[in-house]
């Protein structure tokens, strides 16, 4: 899972949760 090793993906996921 490259997403776990990608800080950008993690940041994007956090923004997605905050945008909810």
UniProtKB/Swiss-Prot annotation:
One of its GO terms (cellular component) is cytoplasm. Signal peptide: none annotated. Keywords: Cytoplasm. Its main location: cytoplasm. It is found in: Cytoplasm. Modulates RecA activity. Belongs to the RecX family. This is Regulatory protein RecX. It comes from Azotobacter vinelandii. The gene is recX.
